[in-house]
Amino acid sequence: MFKELYKDSIVKSLKDKFNYGNIMQVPKLVKVCINMGVGDAATDSKAINEPLDSLYLIAGQKPLSTFAKKSISGFKIRKGATVGCKVTLRRDKMYEFLERLIYIALPREKDFRGFSVKQFDGNGNFSFGIKEHISFLEIDYDKISKIRGMDINIITSAVSDKEAKELLLALKFPFFD
């Protein structure tokens, strides 16, 4: 649905709004990166299995484990230890995930009022976090041992934050300012 919405109406409206000479100049979604930090995995090697399974269910794609670049004694992390997992979504899976995120997960999120414009990075990319991964319907609350958060980065081809915000507003992203 999001892909058709983008192709049918958003491209035309953004082209007119920003006076692009060509539809290839219109900003589009490039990829969505989802990251889940798992601090428990530094001491318990089996602690990463549950977040990997959860991220697989949420994204529909096999996630990769992420490893510590250097040792940090304060966090009891050694270089090369597993510290999280990530997945990068593109094309159809990206649009399916964003649709489930906006219409299902975000309304179920506690104390969610919308996104801020300050969450843009200055280059047209948008980043935010979710406190509870159980907001997604794919996760069975009875089968998980710990509620975890996740970071979501939306990378666009937009040159400025203004263009990226208009693209995300057209895709029904809830902004409060």
From Swiss-Prot:
The keyword Phosphoprotein does not apply. GO terms for biological process: translation. One of its GO terms (molecular function) is rRNA binding. Belongs to the universal ribosomal protein uL5 family. InterPro entries: Ribosomal_uL5, Ribosomal_uL5_bac-type, Ribosomal_uL5_C, Ribosomal_uL5_CS, Ribosomal_uL5_dom_sf, Ribosomal_uL5_N. The keyword RNA-binding applies. PANTHER family: 60S RIBOSOMAL PROTEIN L11-RELATED. HAMAP family: Ribosomal_uL5_B (MF_01333_B). Keywords: Ribonucleoprotein, Ribosomal protein, RNA-binding, rRNA-binding, tRNA-binding. GO terms for cellular component: ribonucleoprotein complex; ribosome. This is Large ribosomal subunit protein uL5. Part of the 50S ribosomal subunit; part of the 5S rRNA/L5/L18/L25 subcomplex. Contacts the 5S rRNA and the P site tRNA. Forms a bridge to the 30S subunit in the 70S ribosome. Disulfide bonds: none annotated. This is one of the proteins that bind and probably mediate the attachment of the 5S RNA into the large ribosomal subunit, where it forms part of the central protuberance. In the 70S ribosome it contacts protein S13 of the 30S subunit (bridge B1b), connecting the 2 subunits; this bridge is implicated in subunit movement. Contacts the P site tRNA; the 5S rRNA and some of its associated proteins might help stabilize positioning of ribosome-bound tRNAs. The lineage of its organism: Bacteria, Pseudomonadati, Pseudomonadota, Alphaproteobacteria, Rickettsiales.
